[in-house]
Amino acid sequence: MSLLATRQRPPRTAPTVAPRPGLWRRIRAAKWSYAYLAPMAVLLLAFVVYPIFASFGYTFYRWNGIGEPGDYVGLANFQQILHDRIFWGAVGHTFVYAFVLVPVQLVLALALALVLNNPKLKFALFFRTVYFIPVVTSAAVVGVVIQLMLANFGDSAGSLLAKTGVTDGQIDWLGDPHTALAVIILIGIWHTLGYNLVYFLAGLQTIPAELYEAAKLDGCGPVQSFFRITIPMLRQVGVVIVVLAFIGSFQVFDLVQVLTGGGPYFATEVVNTYIYHLAFGGSPGSAAQPDVGLASAASFLYGLLLIVFSALQVLALRGIGRRRTAA
């Protein structure tokens, strides 16, 4: 028997795994990272986390915001909000605003993004800046300017529509319950269009140009390339854009508050202006005196509605994406 055959092989041993360091050791290893995060964490706790818990506590009291809350009412605030027709009207107006604004705005933003993404377009940067200027303009300033424009030119537009037979006479654009919400929606579409335009531009610029070149060689036209390449490649970013667009539209407040204050006759009252009027008073039919407890209850109920809607929205968009992928 040869020497190689008789030589004993060393026993195989499992590779040693270093023990996982403890929590304190991991914190010490990243101490500077936590030190840099500490100021933001303190601000988050002070201005986000604490107000949420404090506001939830106020829902059980009748309180005008002065002194300490002392009139404990249990769930009466929630019951009053649930039976308030103005609250449900405000919810309806908010959803109408969102479900009209978001689809129209997304279609316009995608169309403009396709045009501005064309490398042959001259002055593309200038046009991008022009479309984004309304976004960086305060909604309060926009509201005041729109009021001045309607005061100076609204009668002329109403006269023109009356002469063409579209309307029967002059229109008080923000004072008529039938037109006020539509005017606010149109202004909202224009004011926040730049956000979604930038998002779509960013998504379009991630699509490789080789895909369009290959599709062109295969005989695909612009319409086929749009539905076969652009839409599928924008699916992931499109979900994010849709969710963010709905979240932003559900938070509408300043534009409505400046233009109409929720009027006329609560025709444009949205949930955020409703909560504002409850918390600070001054809205006929809502609360003559401030009631922080009612405002907190309304905000929590509205928050629950938005959580449920957002979850259903994400699930629906994911289901649509999976069906398209399977097809």
What are the residue ranges of the model-derived segments?
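A structural signal for multi-pass alpha-helical bundles of membrane permease subunits
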Residues: 29-327
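Short, Lys/Arg-rich, polar N-terminal cytosolic tail immediately upstream
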Residues: 1-27
